[in-house]
């Protein structure tokens, strides 16, 4: 229900609609959670006293499900939703692409701090959302929705200098490092497996087509290729290549 978080009418309706398009259909992580049945971190610590104790934030204790068999954590649904919304907004307002990716990563990080998810859960949520977003943006049936979203974004930014004035370019290196950390969470890298070739998934170029309207698909794919992180990190070496795509860096060029 779009009205729950934003108006589906008015100047920015195109952006609201694109968020709904990306979050619609098969965008939920619930089926994956039911398949993997991977416990949330606070349940692990209760089960094994040798593990670090994880406590849920008091304000979230009411969200704990009584039945642990129906409360999987992998992949994180909140992280998935955050990235889907952020990618839709970034597509609409590409001038703020990297900033929106950073904000999505922050929500995933907050889920870890809250005690509701492990680093692995959050990484899975990012990967899932990236694949889902690309699929929906690549779908020709959504061409009108994408066009309307970009037009709404142009109304939002206009021809003034607001975007430039609000962008903290001095923090770029710090933000880039933060985003990379939240891609990997310093999980152990297999030193013997760091030379795998980058695989850019089919349709991934759609993620950045509004950011680089002057590039063709091949050129955008090379941007994704040249900014992908190295292989060897836990979970990130998926067969298609979604785990290694660094949209923060890719939105800033080769």
Tell where the protein language model's regions lie, with residue ranges.
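Alpha-helical transmembrane segments that form the membrane-embedded catalytic/substrate-binding core
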Residues: 78-82, 112-142
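Hydrophobic alpha-helical bundle signature of multipass membrane enzymes
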Residues: 1-113, 145-164, 168-254
């Amino acid at each position: 229900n779009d009205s729950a978080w934003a108006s589906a009418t008015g100047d920015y309706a195109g952006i609201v609609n694109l968020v709904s398009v990306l979050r619609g259909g098969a965008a939920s992580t619930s089926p994956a959670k039911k398949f993997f049945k991977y416990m949330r971190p606070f349940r692990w610590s209760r089960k094994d006293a040798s593990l670090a104790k994880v406590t849920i934030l008091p304000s979230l204790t009411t969200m704990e499900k009584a039945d642990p068999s129906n409360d999987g954590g992998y992949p994180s649904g909140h992280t998935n939703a955050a990235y889907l919304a952020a990618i839709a907004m970034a597509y609409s307002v590409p001038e703020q692409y990297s900033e929106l990716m950073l904000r999505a990563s922050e929500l995933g990080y907050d889920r870890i701090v809250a005690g509701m998810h492990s680093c692995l859960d959050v990484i899975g949520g990012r990967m899932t959302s990236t694949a889902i977003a690309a699929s929906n943006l690549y779908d020709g049936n959504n061409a009108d929705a994408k066009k309307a979203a970009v037009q709404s974004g142009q109304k939002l930014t206009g021809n003034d200098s607001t975007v430039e004035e609000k962008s903290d370019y001095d923090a770029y290196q710090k933000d880039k490092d933060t985003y990379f950390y939240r891609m990997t969470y310093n999980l152990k890298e297999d030193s013997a497996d760091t030379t795998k070739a980058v695989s850019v998934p089919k349709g991934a170029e759609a993620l950045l087509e509004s950011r680089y309207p002057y590039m063709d698909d091949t050129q955008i794919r090379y941007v994704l290729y040249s900014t992908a992180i190295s292989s060897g990190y836990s979970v990130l070496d998926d067969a298609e290549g979604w785990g290694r795509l660094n949209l923060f860096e890719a939105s800033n060029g080769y």
